[in-house]
Amino acid sequence: MTLTLVKAWTAAKDRLKDAGIDQPSIDARLMLEVAAGVTRTEIVTDPYRELSAEQIATLNDYLERRARREPVSHIIGRKGFWKILLQVNKNVLTPRPETEVIVDEVLKAFPEHMAFSMLDLGVGSGTILLAVLAERPAAKGLGIDASSEALAVARENAANLDLNTRAALLHGDWTTGLGSDSFDLVVSNPPYIPTEVIDTLEPEVRIHEPRLALDGGPDGLAAYRELAPEILRVLKPGGLFAVEIGYDQSQAVEALFRAAGATEVRTVKDLSTHDRVVLGVKNPLESPA
């Protein structure tokens, strides 16, 4: 029996819907694009193109994995973020649209042709670092992560985006070994989910994503307690920081950064109107160490 693109998409949507998957239409299309080697446009403009037996087998494998709640990004090995396409796997946190709030705020603060240095703590797949560097050609950045497997993904992404000459990637423990007053910008999407909450999350997250990137300790604030004074240390006077937070952590995280000496501390909401990013500045009058 022949299977066309339109029939394959319809069957895939139905199969995912029956499996209780959210957004079955989008997931089915993304997996069909990769399995059949087509674009979204081709599915619409050439709907009666037939799939080969190999393509059908690949799509069926993808659908079985998705029905077991493996994330689509892990199945197809990629995820769009901001204006870039990133390679992803089980060793990195899947980029989320709410993290784009950090990129948006950074681009507002740093004009297009401005030269500046940035640090991304817990760089993962390179999500924030590479999205910013792709938009700011005069900028250079350093990404640090405790996971060597995550760094391998980030290096691949930097190379694929031709950003490896401006993005340095190092294995390390947050800011250990970094000099004071070194960066114009520090960003981070640290683990912020309370330990006991992780087991209540959807299977795509609790089973398939690295716990190191999720677990924020008993109250979800462990990373921020460590990061706040260190981010203020490595920032240049007048430098900006932006960190992602959980929806209910704004007050606590703002307080930690104020206690560390930050000024102009504020919280920005995401498109779902949840508190998402805490920003602030290192006192520009502070003398370099």
Curated annotation (Swiss-Prot):
NCBIfam families: hemK_fam, RF_mod_PrmC. It comes from Caulobacter vibrioides (strain ATCC 19089 / CIP 103742 / CB 15) (Caulobacter crescentus). Keywords: Methyltransferase, S-adenosyl-L-methionine, Transferase. Methylates the class 1 translation termination release factors RF1/PrfA and RF2/PrfB on the glutamine residue of the universally conserved GGQ motif. The lineage of its organism: Bacteria, Pseudomonadati, Pseudomonadota, Alphaproteobacteria, Caulobacterales. GO terms for biological process: methylation. The keyword Transferase applies. This is Release factor glutamine methyltransferase. The gene is prmC. InterPro entries: DNA_methylase_N6_adenine_CS (IPR002052), HemK-like (IPR004556), Methyltranfer_dom (IPR025714), N5-glutamine_MTase (IPR050320), PrmC_N (IPR040758), RF_methyltr_PrmC (IPR019874), SAM-dependent_MTases_sf (IPR029063). The keyword S-adenosyl-L-methionine applies.
